[in-house]
Swiss-Prot record:
GO terms for molecular function: leak channel activity; monoatomic cation channel activity; sodium channel activity. Residues 1633-1648 have a biased composition (Low complexity). It comes from Mus musculus (Mouse). The chain crosses the membrane at residues 37-57, 66-90, 107-129, 138-158, 174-199, 295-322, 383-403, 417-439, 448-468, 473-492, 503-530, 579-599, 887-906, 916-939, 948-972, 981-1003, 1016-1039, 1130-1159, 1211-1227, 1237-1260, 1272-1293, 1297-1318, 1332-1357, 1421-1447. Disulfide bonds join 207-239, 229-245, 1046-1057, 1405-1417. This is Sodium leak channel NALCN. Residues 795-830 form a coiled coil. It is found in: Cell membrane.
Length: 1738
């Protein structure tokens, strides 16, 4: 028993358990606790417990008294069950003792706490029933934890087949990421909170009537509507006559009555900033600020707040969730299941003709039971004709249902034509289902999920046609038939399947969202059900609607404000935190999960990505081969090539028909040959450039001499061509690498990643080179054969991949060549080809002049002639901007901008046709555009030329804008009636800003990114329209005519709705004043009207679709919900909630997901595998990485060194960061001159400023002024500190409002330095900054589009009368106000109400037949198209592009320790080592220092010279080869390390992979050559050493004998002659040595290893001999013998040594050495040219 228990514990250890429901004991007495049915019963009881607590509210018991006893009974039963379970588990596990005791298990503790809460709830209910405790008392809050028992119901699904440590790491890492982004959000909330406090302060000044007295402020004292004002006369809004501007707080109103939103102090300010960042109600705050303070301050604050907080910072949450989900997806692939396995392996597949006539592979079950129908019926049932007939009938049914409309109150509703049509269609589809069941058999029919759905519709619609059920919830079944139409389009069907996947992910997420809503609703219900005057949480349905409203963000501020006012001032902060946390989780994390799931479903599999990469490359090659259709038209005409014509020729001679292009080749031949020679012979070109006036004969003679001298062999020429091709590839690769790079990481491993990748490459190349000669030997074992076979397979796969890549490259080159050949053939055979307007000649001087003017552009970039890299100049960014477009385009951009500025001054009251000053810009624009278009047409042609003006949509738009401007300028209509052609022309004229899209290349790229994903966006639109059509048809059938009601709430029947009544006026939404006894709200008398709601109705499908489209944008759905519940019934509220949930959670997130996927596809990252995407992120990180701007520590241990240690200590840095935060807290209240609190706060700020001066002084002393100035962060600190010192001086000198404002600005600037001191904040701020930089052109595109709509809005709605939302602040009277309104609409703030205000028609307005500026009516069709198109383009597409950019950039900084290629720690280590080598902090080091840098690296970048000596040589030689022995930068070395640290086969794309492999192969060959040379040199040195040693032994013996003899013989005459000859020889040897050494230095390897350097050092000082010195003398023997005899007789040290060596025969080693030397000499003469050229050229 014990062994079995241990084994079960061990097996369960690596798997994450799902709680204490597992069987942990085999005790027979408590065996029931381990039964599966007990587990299921307890899970059901958990759901029952949640239902019970949802019913347990005072209001519910008041409406349904028996529920009090029902809940008491249920809770009692649940209490007994869970208590018994708890006792049994305590008995099994033990309470405290043991490893698995009850207290030590977290799930058991949770279950025990739930049992305790159940007991508390039960005891409390007993007291409530006995009337001991009041039901409305706060004691009911003890039930708040009870809904958490819902976790027990779903705990079983938390069981993962993964190691617990891995799941813990994933959750920990995800939590860290979410926590980091939350800190980032808090930083911006605090920043804008401080800014709000100092810029605005309180909004307590209102316009009140003149006789208002303190303590007597009522609703009738305020202006209607309530208006804020400014006490200063120069700024803000001034009250009208009869009113005065007063502070309501001074008049006696409390904080609760004034409302909680504002910028009074830092807490309220952060609360208000968060409300505004949710884009709900922010615009009304801005209007209040505009009325109370200077206008520019409000616009700056709120627009930047929306841009940074709402659009950038909050979208980082989406990026975090997407990245985290992508990582979890890889780990949980087993749990979700694979998306590709749609059919089981047991089923077979066959081709089937689909409805569109195409073929599809469909699964066919061989064993499917067939029905009893005849074969002809079965064949008919499977035919495409039958399929299309049924779908066409579904289409007709949908059209008929959509045609239904409200026909009036007196019309008979039961048996109209729509009902009869529905009966007919129901019978038809019933017959279809019966036929399929007859043909397939019931089992075969029901096995298909599609047939199950059809059967459900058949049953539901059959019940629906029953008269009593016709207008009921069964209508859903009828309208759901439209879903069957998805089968018509295979693309739509595939898209739907791709998005929703197997349904498990999205379904589980929907269940999770619903469960979260239920739990949070139950918690809020028990928290607020006892609060008086709050009806939002009295019952569970109301609580659910309120929490769902917060989830959708529509009106969530109203829910929170009502709750805050009801709970009182004391509990308001806690309640606000509760709602904000729930809103934060629901809107950011939960919605981001939906986006992540949809993006995951749109993701392709890894193998499909590589296949699609190849297919896409092939498709690109095919498309490049074809000419555009406008040029292929010339192929339809007969060929008429131009022939040679000679102007002066006698008539006796006839010119043969020779093509002019053929003769031109010979005419230009001499010039081409000369250019070719100049390319080959650099000396020739230089000499000719030096003497340009040299005669032609001398030139030819000089060239001829050069040609004769330089004789090129065939091999050298081929070698040159090969090197040139390789050089081009390497230059391209170098250029690409110099512009890219970056790094992130993994934990340190035992083995360096450089070493691992090097061994992978070596193994791969050994396979590639050795597999051709692989033969199976007889003695090999089976394992060896298997290994060899796998190696062969791997080699073949690699070889096949290589061949595919090369084939695609060749295909691309051939396509480009083919296209050029086609163009040349057309140019030669058709005289009118490439002739602008068929008039201007191809090479005409005027056309060449136009080309020069059109294509002239600024170009200040300098290119390195060796590497081809672009050298960065000092102002290269400015130069790049100037060279972005041509000079002509710059002129037109300037003219267009000036014209748009002029258009901004137009209004309905200052029109261009009546204002001569506005006409100047109009004339200038048309004149300049005429000149531009004429130049471009004469240079490039209009349409039928290769580079025509009209070759894409941009050219068409240019011509269209020009024609519209020209027609308007010529016409200039004086009277423009509304909805006329002249007004349409004025609207089209507003498209002028779109010209900038065409003129700027990056703007054209934005447009391509928008329209390239049009197909997917179109499919999403179809899905959403289908959803809207389903619900619109349902709404028409259920709510048509039912939403109309009398505007007097006291009248119920239509007959009584007549006469007049008094209606109250809404004065203010912010103030919470209570009516005093006898007081009435302001109002007036109006007639009673029986009418639909103003903004929506369901009387026909068109109006219903419009209402649902507004609801789909999550605007106005709360009003639709309230009207439906109030006028039709509470049960029908489910309708709008289901639609909003589907539209919000799935519909809108679909747009986000599709736009992000399309953006990735356009960027080229959609088809990248995981490794390739990480490699791209790595290169992008490398761009951002910079050397550390930190000077080295002073050498000695003096005062500066101690200062350096102090300033670099972490404790010092944290202290400074805390001081910065402490100084920022001083801005918690507004610094006002009149406030006595300001003086001590400013004094404390002065103290902080002196502390920061001390900090800067210490750093300057420690680092020296030059070292301090290296860091940008130090420069910023110095700037802020200097400003602080200036402020201190001004503060004590002046002490006025301006000095206080300056002091607050200095503190805010100091607050920004927090980001640099915190790693996570710095990383996330970098994400936002880079996103802003990359999205600059998208933002400019949004603004240009906004400008076009603003100009059109001024023309269409400039004089519309004020309504509910068109008012003093929001209107289209000028372009500036129109831009403000449109920016408000971008955020979705009541855009539908503004649209309805602009739709106002007579009799509610005054029309005018002659001029549009004299009427105050709107334009119904214009408003519909205007607002809907603007909202879809901007809010659904353009804003989601911002999200896509943020997601892309966040992935650069998203660090996971396991999966990244290089971590931040590795990069930090490299920066520190670089600073050690780059001691001068220049950012570059000489090439020879690279080897020292590489030897100093440790960790994952370490190169072990004992194991990876060859890798070390390759890396050093790569640096020397790419940079020609010059200086290398920080990014050069980091880029080389990045290439060496990845598996290039997996990470690099096709072109880059080829270039990189070619470079590495070349480096290997060169290093191999150098290694051979080094080895031969060492061998020769060793041979020399042996020969010298043998000669020295004999010489020493001879010398000793000669010394003894020399004592007796001293012939002076002979001694003086012989050594002189020898000395000459020695002197010759020495004179030859420098040449030899220089030659060896030239040919020595460019990198030397340690062994070679030691050998050279050991040989230093030894005699060096020439190569020919070891050859035997050729003189006759007698002479040598005579000489030797003389020498022996007379002696001499040098001579004796030479003679001995010559007389002894050479040993075998010496003869071998001479042969090696001869071979070595030949190799040097041949290979020195090749290798030397390689090194120098590249």
């Amino acid at each position: 028993m014990l062994k079995r228990k241990q084994s079960s514990r061990v097996e369960a250890q690596p798997v994450t358990d799902f709680g204490p429901d597992e069987s942990l004991s085999d005790n027979a007495d408590i065996l029931w606790i381990n039964k599966p049915w007990v587990h299921s019963l307890l899970r059901i009881c958990a759901i029952i417990s949640v239902i019970s607590v949802c019913m347990n509210t005072p209001m519910t018991f008041e409406h349904y008294p028996p529920l009090q006893y029902v809940t008491f009974t249920l809770d009692t039963l649940l209490m007994f069950l869970y208590t018994a379970e708890m006792i049994a588990k305590m008995h099994i596990r033990g309470i405290v003792k043991g490893d698995s005791s009850y207290v030590k298990d977290r799930w058991c503790v949770f279950d025990g706490f739930m049992v305790f809460c159940l007991w508390v709830s039960l005891v409390l209910q007993v007291f409530e029933i006995a009337d001991i405790v009041d039901q409305m008392s706060p004691w009911g809050m003890l039930r708040i934890p009870r809904p958490l028992i819902m976790i027990r119901a779903f705990r079983i699904y938390f069981r993962f087949e993964l190691p617990r440590t891995r799941i813990t790491n994933i959750l920990k890492r995800s939590g860290e990421q979410i926590w980091s982004v939350s800190i980032f959000l808090l930083f911006f909330l605090l920043l804008y909170g401080i800014l709000g406090v100092q810029m605005f302060g309180t909004f307590t000044y209102h316009c009140v009537v003149n006789d208002t007295k303190p303590g007597n402020v009522t609703w009738n004292s305020l202006a209607i509507p309530d208006t804020h004002c400014s006490p200063e006369l120069e700024e803000g809004y001034q009250c009208p006559p009869g009113f005065k501007c007063m502070d309501l707080e001074d008049l006696g109103l409390s904080r609760q009555e004034l409302g909680y939103s504002g910028f009074n102090e830092i807490g309220t300010s952060i609360f208000t900033v968060y409300e505004a960042s949710s884009q709900e109600g922010w615009v009304f705050l801005m209007y209040r600020a505009i009325d109370s303070f200077p206008r520019w301050r409000s616009y700056f604050y709120f627009i930047t707040l929306i841009f940074f907080l709402a659009w950038l910072v909050k979208n980082v949450f989406i990026a975090v969730i997407i990245e985290t989900f992508a990582e979890i997806r890889v780990q949980f692939q087993q749990m979700w299941g694979t998306r590709s396995s749609t059919t089981s392996t047991a089923t077979t597949q066959m081709f089937h003709e689909d409805a569109a006539g195409g073929w599809q592979l469909v699964a066919v079950d061989v064993n499917k039971p067939q029905g009893r129908a005849p074969a002809c019926l079965q064949k008919m049932m499977r035919s495409s004709v039958f399929h299309m007939f049924i779908l066409s009938m579904v289409t007709v049914d949908v059209i008929v249902a959509a045609s239904n409309y409200y026909k009036g109150e007196n019309f008979r509703r039961q048996y109209d034509e729509f009902y009869l049509a529905e009966v007919a269609f129901t019978v038809l589809f019933d017959l279809e289902a019966l036929l399929k069941i007859w043909c397939l058999g019931f089992t075969g029919y029901i096995s298909s999920s599609l047939h199950k759905f059809e059967l459900l519709l058949v049953i539901g619609t059959t019940l629906h046609v029953y008269p009593d059920l016709y207008h009921s919830q069964f209508t859903y079944f009828q309208v759901l038939r439209v879903v069957r139409l998805i089968k018509i389009s295979p693309a739509l069907e595939d898209f739907v399947y791709k998005i929703f996947g197997p349904g498990k992910k999205l379904g589980s997420l929907v269940v999770f969202t619903a469960s979260l809503l239920i739990v949070m609703s139950a918690i809020s219900l028990q928290m607020f059900c006892f609060v008086e005057e709050l009806d939002r949480f009295t019952t569970f349905p109301r609580a659910f609607m309120s929490m769902f409203q917060i989830l959708t963000q529509e009106g969530w501020v109203d829910v929170m404000d009502q709750t805050l006012n009801a709970v009182g001032h004391m509990w308001a902060p806690l309640v606000a935190i509760y709602f904000i946390l729930y809103h934060l989780f629901a809107t950011l994390i939960l919605l981001s999960l939906f986006v992540a799931v949809i993006l995951d479903n749109l993701e392709l599999d890894e193998d499909l990505k590589k296949l699609k990469q190849l297919k896409q490359s092939e498709a690109n090659a095919d498309t490049k081969e074809k000419l555009p259709l406008r040029l292929r038209i010339f192929e339809k005409f007969p060929n008429r090539p131009q022939m040679v014509k000679i102007s002066k020729l006698p008539s006796d001679f006839t010119v043969p028909k020779i093509r002019e292009s053929f003769m031109k080749q010979f005419i230009d031949r001499q010039q081409q040959d000369t250019c070719c020679l100049f390319r080959i012979l650099p000396s020739t070109s230089s000499s000719s450039c030096d003497n340009p006036k040299k005669p032609t004969a001398e030139d030819n003679k000089y060239i001829d001499q050069k040609l004769r001298k330089s004789v090129f062999s065939i091999r050298a020429r081929n070698l040159l061509e090969k090197e040139t091709a390789v050089t081009k590839i390497l230059r391209a690769c170098t250029r690409q690498r110099m512009l890219s790079g970056s790094f992130e990481g993994q934990p340190a491993k035992e083995r360096s990643i450089l070493s691992v990748q090097h061994h992978i490459r070596q193994e791969r190349r050994s396979l590639r080179h050795g597999s051709n000669s692989q033969r199976i030997s007889r003695g090999k074992s089976l394992e060896t054969l298997t290994q060899d076979h796998s190696n062969t397979v791997r080699y073949r796969n690699a070889q096949r991949e290589d061949s595919e890549i090369k084939m695609i490259q060749e295909k691309k080159e051939q396509a480009e060549m083919k296209r050029k050949v086609q163009e040349e053939e057309l140019r030669e055979n058709h005289p009118y080809f490439d002739k602008p307007l068929f008039i201007v000649g191809r090479e005409h001087r005027f056309r060449n002049f136009c080309r020069v003017v059109v294509r002239a552009r600024f170009n200040a970039s300098k290119t390195d002639p060796v590497t081809g890299a672009v050298k960065n100049t000092k102002y290269h960014q400015l130069y790049d901007l100037l060279g972005l477009v041509t000079y002509l385009d710059w002129v037109m951009i300037t003219v267009t901008i000036c014209s748009c500025i002029s258009m901004m001054f137009e209004s309905p009251f200052r029109r261009v046709m009546h204002a001569p000053t506005l006409q100047i810009a109009e004339y200038v624009f048309v004149i300049f555009m005429s000149i531009e278009l004429n130049l471009k047409i004469m240079a490039d042609g209009l349409f039928f030329t290769p580079t025509a003006v009209i070759r894409d949509f941009g050219g068409v738009m240019d011509i269209f804008i020009y024609l519209v401007s020209l027609i308007f300028l010529c016409w200039m209509p004086q009277n423009v009636p509304a909805e006329s052609g002249a007004q349409l022309l004025m609207v089209l004229r507003c498209l002028r800003p779109l010209r900038i899209f065409k003129l700027v290349p990056q703007m054209r790229k934005v447009v391509r990114e928008l329209f390239s994903g049009f197909k997917e966006i179109f499919l999403v639109s179809i899905l959403l329209l289908t959803l809207m059509l389903v619900f619109a048809s349902f709404g028409v059938q259920l709510f048509a005519g039912k939403l109309a009601k009398c505007n007097d709430p006291n009248i119920i029947r239509r007959e009584d709705c007549n006469g007049i009544f008094r209606i109250n006026v809404s004065v203010s939404k912010n103030l919470n004043l209570k009516l005093r006894p006898g007081e009435k709200k302001p109002g007036f008398w109006v007639p009673r009207v029986w009418a639909n709601p103003r903004n929506f109705n369901f009387d026909n499908v068109g109006n219903a679709m419009l209402a649902l489209f507004e609801v789909l944008s999550l605007k106005g759905w709360v009003e639709v919900r309230d009207v439906i519940i109030h006028r039709v019934g509470p049960i029908h509220g489910i309708y709008i909630h289901v639609f909003v949930f589907l539209g919000c959670m799935i519909g809108l997130t679909l747009f986000v997901g599709v736009v992000i996927a399309n953006f990735n596809e356009n960027k080229g990252t959609a088809l990248l595998t995981v490794d390739q995407r990480r490699w791209e992120d790595l290169k992008s990180r490398l761009k951002i990485a910079q050397p550390l701007h930190l000077p080295p520590r002073p050498d000695n241990d003096g005062f500066r060194a101690k200062m350096y240690d102090i300033t670099q200590h972490p404790f010092f840095k944290r202290t400074i960061a805390l001081l910065v935060l402490a100084q920022s807290v001083l801005l918690s209240v507004k610094w006002d001159v009149d406030d006595p609190v300001t003086v001590p706060l400013a004094t404390m700020s002065v103290v902080f400023t002196f502390i920061f001066v001390l900090e800067v002084t210490m750093k300057i002393i420690a680092m020296s002024p030059a070292g301090f100035w290296q860091s940008r962060r130090n420069r910023y600190d110095l700037l802020v500190t200097s400003l602080g010192v200036v402020w201190v001086v001004l503060h004590f000198a002046l002490l006025n409002a301006y000095t206080y404002m300056m002091g607050a600005c200095v503190i805010v600037f100091r607050f920004f330095s927090i980001c640099g001191k915190h790693v996570t904040l710095k990383m996330l701020l970098l994400t936002v900054v880079v996103s802003m930089y990359k999205s600059f052109f998208i933002i400019v595109g949004m603004f240009l589009l906004l400008l076009c709509y603003a100009f059109a809005g001024v023309v269409l709605f400039g004089t519309v009368k004020y309504g509910e939302n068109i008012n003093r602040h929001a209107n289209f009277s000028s372009a500036g106000k129109a831009i403000t309104v449109l920016f408000r609409i971008v955020t979705g703030e009541d855009w539908n109400k503004i649209m309805h205000d602009c739709m106002v028609q007579p009799p509610f307005c005054t029309p005018d037949e002659f001029t549009y500026w004299a009427t105050d009516c709107g334009n119904y069709a214009g408003a519909l198209m205007y607002f809907c198109s603007f909202y879809v383009i901007i809010a659904y597409i353009m804003l989601n592009l911002l999200v896509a950019i943020i997601v892309e950039n966040f992935s650069l900084f998203y660090s996971t320790e396991e999966d990244q290629l290089l971590s931040y720690n590795d990069l930090r280590h490299f920066q520190i080592i670089w600073n050690m080598v780059d001691d001068k902090r220049e950012g570059v080091i000489p090439t020879f220092r690279v080897k020292f840098l590489l030897r100093l690296l440790r960790g994952r970048l370490e190169v072990d010279l004992d194991k990876d000596k060859l890798l070390f040589k390759h890396m050093c030689y790569e640096m020397e080869r790419l940079h020609n022995g010059g200086d290398v930068t920080f990014h050069d070395v980091l880029s080389m390390l990045s290439y060496r640290s990845v598996d290039i086969r997996k990470s690099l794309q096709l072109e880059e992979l080829l270039a990189r492999e070619q470079l590495e192969y070349t480096i290997e060959e060169e290093v191999a050559k150098q290694t051979i040379r080094m080895w031969l040199k060492k061998c020769l040195k060793r041979i020399r050493a042996k020969q010298q040693q043998s000669c020295s032994i004999i010489h020493s013996l001879r010398e000793s004998q000669e010394q003894e003899r020399s004592r007796f013989l001293n012939p002076p005459s002979i001694e003086t002659t012989q050594p002189s000859e020898d000395s000459n020889a020695n002197s010759q040897d020495h004179s030859m040595q420098p040449e030899t050494s220089s030659q060896q230095q030239l040919l020595s390897p460019t990198l030397s290893d340690r062994g070679g350097s030691r050998q050279d050092a050991a040989d230093t000082g030894k005699p060096q001999r020439k190569i020919g010195q070891w050859r035997l003398p050729s003189a006759p023997k007698p002479i040598s013998h005579s000489v030797s005899s003389v020498n022996l007789r007379f002696g001499g040290r040098t001579t004796m040594k030479t003679v001995v060596c010559k007389m002894n025969p050479m040993p075998d080693t010496a003869s071998c050495g001479s042969e090696v030397k001869k071979w070595w000499t030949r190799q040097l003469t041949v290979e020195s040219d090749e290798s030397g050229d390689d090194l120098l050229d590249i």
